[in-house]
Amino acid sequence: MSTEREAKVYVNGSLVGTHENPEELAEQIREARRRGEVSEMVNVSVRDRTGEVIVNADAGRARRPLLVVENGEPVVTQEEVEAVKNGDIDFEDLVEAGKVEFIDAEEEEDILVGVEEEELTTDHTHLEIDPQLIFGIGAGMIPYPEHNASPRITMGAGMMKQSLGLPAANYRIRPDTRQHLLHYPQKAMVNTQTTEQIGYDDRPAGQNFVVAVMSYEGFNIEDALVMNKGSVERALSRSHFFRTYEGEERRYPGGQEDRFEIPGDDVRGARGEDAYTHLDDDGLVNPETKVDDSSVLLGKTSPPRFLEEPEDMGGLSPQKRRETSVTMRSGEDGVVDTVTLMEGEDGSKLAKVSVRDERIPELGDKFASRHGQKGVVGHLAPQEDMPFTQEGVVPDLVLNPHALPSRMTVGHVLEMLGGKAGSLDGRSVDGTPFTGEGEDEIRGTLEDRGFKSSGKEVMYSGVSGEKIEAEIFVGTIFYHKLYHMVSNKLHARSKGPVQVLTRQPTEGRAREGGLRVGEMERDTVIGHGAAMVLKERLLDSSDREEIHVCGNCGMTAVENYEQRRVYCPNCEEETDVHSIEMSYAFKLLLDEMKALGIAPRLELEEAV
């Protein structure tokens, strides 16, 4: 160790020494790495503020390959590029030769990367292998992303992961809890090189829609989409939803165990014969049976939890088994797809029932293009009411023009043009970032095919048959159906379960919960002066409770049912006891304060 002015050197986070010239040390390590004297896994960087040299060679770092640049020129020659293409040399050979480097996040702070060879200067240290590699897998699948605003690329990449397709070819035998399957997935008309590299075209997750950009009777304002009912009836964006239910014959201490069977009348909590009509004798439902809300899928009984109360005769009563059948979730229906029997780890019998439900696009279902242009179906228009072109083409979807300008998703417009050109030519259009097919080329294809280069067409109103004054932009674009479907989200409640502790309605759709009236909702009711509505929502429909309070001391009174009297245990009074209406949550607060040794007292006044 030397003077304080020397820079500290860290290797994998441990201080190993100091050096008087950190920049020179870092450069020496880099040169040694390129010569093969230091492992290609090593990365080095110099901290700007402190001058510390950080050397990393540990596992778990995300690194990416870049071409080395010296004096404004890539070190890799065109001959070597051709040799890699032809298979004469491997990519790894270029790495070993120090002509391609893998850079981690920390070293990336110290380098200047050029995106294209034309922009290289003497200051540049590295060059991207291909401009599209600045994107990941998700963003790389978006066509023409360089024409979009960055938040839209992020949204497009995110929603691509939520799209429905064919998740696995063995979906019939996979026991996934939830699974979606799109009918007739299509290969996108406009593709990128990333799409081809990952084999997305072999198993796509979307369909090509014919889209007209125009308003439609106000049904597509605020990102709503108008869909052609005829297309939907011809199975556009139709999908199936699979949910797997599971039951197990558990074993308990003492040799008792669960049993798959039809619960008899002697079973505690049995639902009656009607509930079990579609079960076989073994307690399992048959495939292709229609099931709906709270249908029993697996008839099951369990041993009792506790010994019964003693009978008058002195002995214990015979133990009754409990009903613990597996039922459908509330609000869901469908058809039993498969019933699978298997064995658990401890040798217990395991049953899995898969239920499928056909999902036809309906009002409220979410769709999105690859450019972050998401929307929900606002209207299903009959085909005869949809606008049509001179050739008689009726669009599958009508998109509001206001969705485009402020969001600057020009890539969406270009994909529509490219999709139209590809459809007419019967070919796939390359929309790879930075290097894809140009706009002029696409426009030329449209003109060659007898269409306007702008993509606009004369359209006629389906309702009146009159020609629409403005020309309408029509094209083909790849749309995803997302798994956010209204049938999974629709929820309402009038009465239902309450929480044990607070006696307020449960929370959430899965628990058949109530809809919370929060502070802001409360304020709007106050603003209307609707006092009785306020009381009804916040008290009567929630956790109203009547308790007896002593008017003398303000303590909670006691009701003795056997003696049929209500009295205050504090004052021993019976005359001055009043029945008070309050929230059970408040009563719980009073009880918890009493448990802490605090005696809350209520001051009673006559209601006006």
Curated annotation (Swiss-Prot):
It comes from the Archaea. InterPro entries: DNA-dir_RNA_pol_su2, DNA-dir_RNAP_su2_dom, DNA-dir_RNAP_su2_hyb_sf, RNA_pol_bsu_CS, RNA_pol_Rpb2_4, RNA_pol_Rpb2_7, RNA_pol_RPB2_OB-fold, RNAP_Rpo2. Binds 1 Zn(2+) per subunit. Keywords: Cytoplasm, DNA-binding, DNA-directed RNA polymerase, Metal-binding, Nucleotidyltransferase, Transcription, Transferase, Zinc. PROSITE patterns: RNA_POL_BETA. GO terms for cellular component: cytoplasm; DNA-directed RNA polymerase complex. It catalyses: RNA(n) + a ribonucleoside 5'-triphosphate = RNA(n+1) + diphosphate. Part of the RNA polymerase complex. DNA-dependent RNA polymerase (RNAP) catalyzes the transcription of DNA into RNA using the four ribonucleoside triphosphates as substrates. The Rpo2 subunit (Rpo2N and Rpo2C in this organism) is implicated in DNA promoter recognition and in nucleotide binding. Belongs to the RNA polymerase beta chain family. This is DNA-directed RNA polymerase subunit Rpo2C. It comes from Halobacterium salinarum (strain ATCC 29341 / DSM 671 / R1).
